[in-house]
Regions:
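N-terminal amphipathic/basic leader segments beginning at the initiator methionine
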Residues: 1-17
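A short, well-ordered alpha-helical element
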Residues: 12-15, 31-56
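A generic structural motif
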Residues: 117-124
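Amphipathic alpha-helical interaction surfaces in cytosolic regulatory modules
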Residues: 42, 61-109
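Short, aliphatic-rich beta-strand segments
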Residues: 22-28
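A general structural motif
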Residues: 21, 54-58, 86-90
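Short, histidine-centered active-site or binding-site loop motifs used for metal coordination
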Residues: 28-30, 63
Length: 124
């Protein structure tokens, strides 16, 4: 299985998923014209990854902003990760200390999913 990588643009986040280490990174802004189409290749890739995951899967989220349709796609990503059995899965949610919206979003996701989300402040 190959790694998954998409370069960041002004409207889409960087997506870097290393299958050999289980380290995943999503960073930047997520406001694509069509979130479902943008995230579809990643969701398909995750469907394959969860069949043979690493012993530990660590997903770092460092988003500056995301729109409502992107949040629905994030839930879909998290639902895929919930399907990983027999391996550790952790989501690290990074937010700037003065960004209450991103902090609240991370807290909201903690309520929705069955994966530990570790909240981490990025100090300015």
């Amino acid at each position: 299985m190959e790694n998954f990588f998409l370069e960041e643009t002004s409207k889409t986040p960087k997506l870097s998923f290393d299958v050999s280490t289980g380290k995943f990174l999503m960073s930047g802004r997520s406001i694509p014209e069509n979130s479902i189409e943008f995230y579809k290749p990643l969701l398909e890739w995750l469907d394959e990854y969860i069949k043979k995951p690493c012993a530990k899967t660590e997903f770092d989220i460092k988003l500056e902003y995301f729109n409502t349709s992107s949040s629905k796609c994030l839930v879909e990503i998290f639902r895929r990760l919930e399907k990983i059995k027999g391996a550790e899965v952790v989501i690290n949610w990074f937010y700037e200390e003065d960004d209450e919206d991103m902090q609240e979003s991370g807290e909201d996701f903690k309520e929705l999913i069955d994966i530990p989300i570790i909240m981490s402040v990025i100090e300015n």
